[in-house]
């Protein structure tokens, strides 16, 4: 799992409280991963691709393949070979122009409360850092745990995830490690899933 932090982030020597937020289904309505693929390739290519991926999606739905494998199949189909710089730019644009339309007002108010209290904020998700990190920076988060796209020597997307996927236990392990480094006196957690 990739972890991104703001440049000015320090260890939590003052033992400031930490608020940990899940993303998909908690801060935003629904999923961010598949809409990002549609955002990158456009509607027609996206729907054709989803038809092609249907057997894999069915295998995932029935538990035949795991979350990482289906995610890499989708990434490979839609993003493999694309310049990493282009995908980073699209991730920033997606964070600024699309994700805010899916934000849940109650959760955004909760984030604002923690920001006003000067709490440290961590965004923890199995979604892609390429758009989570810019969204988190806009919304005053101090750190982000998410899935990092693998990039080859020519700065192109390989279609794989670099490191852990950040789903289920991997997400919990990343958050636990992040919290252990800061030793907060209090932790708030917001989520809707594993």
What are these regions (language model features)?
Residues 43-46, 63-66, 83-86, 105-106, ...:
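Conserved alpha/beta cores of soluble small-molecule-handling proteins
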Residues 11-12, 16, 89, 96-194:
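C-terminal cap/substrate-recognition subdomain and adjoining C-terminal extension
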Residues 6-66:
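Active-site neighborhood of HAD-like aspartate-dependent phosphohydrolases
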Residues 70-106:
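Metal-dependent phosphoesterase signature
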């Amino acid at each position: 799992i990739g972890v991104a932090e703001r440049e000015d982030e320090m260890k939590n020597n003052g033992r400031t409280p930490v608020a940990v937020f899940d993303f998909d289904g908690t801060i935003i309505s629904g999923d961010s991963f598949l809409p990002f693929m549609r955002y990158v390739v456009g509607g027609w290519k996206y729907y054709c691709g989803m038809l092609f991926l249907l057997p894999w999606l069915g295998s995932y739905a029935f538990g035949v393949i795991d979350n990482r494998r289906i995610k890499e199949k989708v990434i490979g189909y839609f993003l493999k070979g694309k310049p990493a710089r282009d995908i980073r730019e699209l991730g920033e644009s997606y964070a600024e122009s699309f994700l805010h339309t899916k934000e849940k007002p109650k959760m955004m108010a909760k984030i604002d409360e923690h920001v006003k209290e000067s709490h440290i904020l961590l965004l923890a998700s199995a979604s892609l850092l390429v758009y989570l990190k810019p969204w988190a920076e806009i919304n005053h988060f101090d750190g982000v745990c998410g899935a990092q796209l693998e990039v080859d020597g020519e700065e192109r997307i390989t279609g794989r995830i670099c490191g852990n996927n950040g789903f289920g236990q991997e997400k919990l392990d990343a958050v636990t490690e992040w919290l252990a480094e800061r030793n907060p006196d209090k932790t708030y957690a917001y989520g809707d899933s594993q």
